[in-house]
């Protein structure tokens, strides 16, 4: 089959949507399909379209539907789709109506959809390849934050929490991710000057991000909204404990009973939990154990199989996932 994958993120941009598109393209090619990843649909015939982001890919979705009304059309709902745009944005709402099937990236996403839309929705957890263990730093309790400096990510909550830690704490925050504008960059620089425990590293090659993640004691994801963050998948794969804002997308990734949630936007609660993880081995071990139990959700073989099931469902074909180990696409940047 010829499959067009549309993502609003250009090839030079290494955000979650682009990484998902490239990873899925690799899986689909391994399953025997011809795949083209595009920012906008180029008008060429395809047997199926996979569009990431209901609102931002709406123009491509609508044109494809009008040109190929009998051809399967799959729309993948992102965090801003699920937790903002589908409530009041006509383009996002129309994209969902036009879709043959919808995809959410964690199970809690289903709760945001009307019953008629849930009936045509698949859940596909994003996967991450295994990371070779790296010994943690001995003199520091290293905490990493991975994500671009965007408002939806609440990017500086961890820095603000670091400022509240007692002097005895060895916690240091290392933040990897590009600033989306000069205002965010200046704010990060100001916080670095003011808070010695916080260091903004900026955008980094994917291998460096993974190496620093693997040696970290904790990864913090502080977002106001998440569709199903791939950085959580990376942390689970690496065996790194997560402290997360208590938003639906994070709960869908880590489970309702996970012990590492803090009230979103509350740096005081985050600081308390970070210090508790640093100083209480039983709590830290609990987080490790619970994260290990979620690792099965983010295996490449499972994501590939779920993707094959989706294609089969919309085309009426039977497609088998490869039984051999799956090689992994290697993005240049991943933040």
Indicate residue ranges for each PLM-predicted region:
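A charged, aromatic-enriched C-terminal amphipathic alpha-helix characteristic of glycosyltransferases
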Residues: 15-16, 133, 282-312, 316
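Short hydrophobic beta-strand element within catalytic cores of glycosyltransferases
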Residues: 241-244
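Conserved acidic donor-binding segment of nucleotide-sugar-dependent glycosyltransferases
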Residues: 256-267, 276-281
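Nucleotide-activated donor-binding/catalytic signature segment of Leloir-type glycosyltransferases, i.e.
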Residues: 186-207
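Conserved donor-binding/catalytic core segment of Leloir-type glycosyltransferases
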Residues: 135-165, 173-176
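A short, active-site helix/loop in glycosyltransferases that binds the activated sugar's phosphate group
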Residues: 97-123, 128-131
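Short alpha-helical donor nucleotide-sugar binding micro-motif in glycosyltransferases
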Residues: 96, 203-204, 211-216
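Aromatic "clamp/platform" in nucleotide-sugar-dependent glycosyltransferases that forms part
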Residues: 224-225
């Amino acid at each position: 089959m010829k499959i067009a994958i549309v993502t609003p993120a250009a090839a030079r941009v290494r955000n979650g949507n682009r990484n998902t598109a490239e990873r899925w393209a690799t899986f689909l090619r391994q399953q025997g399909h011809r795949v083209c990843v595009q920012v906008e649909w180029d008008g060429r015939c395809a047997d199926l379209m996979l569009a990431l982001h209901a609102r931002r890919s709406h123009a491509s979705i609508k044109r494809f539907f009008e040109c190929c009304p009998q051809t399967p059309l799959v729309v993948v709902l992102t965090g801003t789709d699920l937790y903002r745009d589908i409530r009041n944005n006509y383009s996002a709402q129309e994209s969902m109506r036009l879709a043959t099937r919808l995809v959410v990236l964690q199970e809690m996403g289903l709760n945001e959809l009307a019953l008629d839309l849930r009936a045509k929705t698949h859940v596909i957890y994003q996967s991450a390849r295994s990371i070779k263990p790296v010994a943690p730093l001995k003199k520091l309790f290293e905490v990493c934050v991975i994500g671009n400096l965007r408002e939806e990510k609440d990017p500086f909550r961890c820095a603000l929490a670091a400022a509240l830690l007692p002097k005895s704490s060895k916690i240091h925050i290392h933040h990897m991710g590009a600033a989306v504008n000069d205002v965010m960059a200046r704010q990060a620089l100001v916080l670095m000057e003011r808070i010695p425990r916080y260091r903004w590293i900026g955008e980094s090659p994917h291998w460096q991000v993974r190496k620093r993640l693997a040696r970290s004691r904790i990864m913090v994801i502080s977002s106001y909204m998440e569709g199903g963050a791939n950085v959580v998948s990376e942390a689970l794969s690496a065996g790194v404990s997560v402290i997360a804002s208590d938003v639906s997308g994070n709960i869908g990734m880590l489970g309702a009973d996970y012990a590492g949630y803090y009230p979103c936007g509350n740096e005081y609660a985050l600081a308390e939990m970070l210090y508790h993880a640093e100083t209480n081995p039983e709590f830290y071990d609990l987080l490790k154990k619970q994260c290990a139990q979620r690792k099965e959700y983010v295996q490449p073989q499972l994501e590939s199989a779920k993707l094959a099931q989706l294609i089969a469902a919309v085309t009426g074909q039977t497609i088998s996932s490869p039984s051999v180990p799956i090689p992994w696409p290697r993005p240049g940047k991943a933040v």
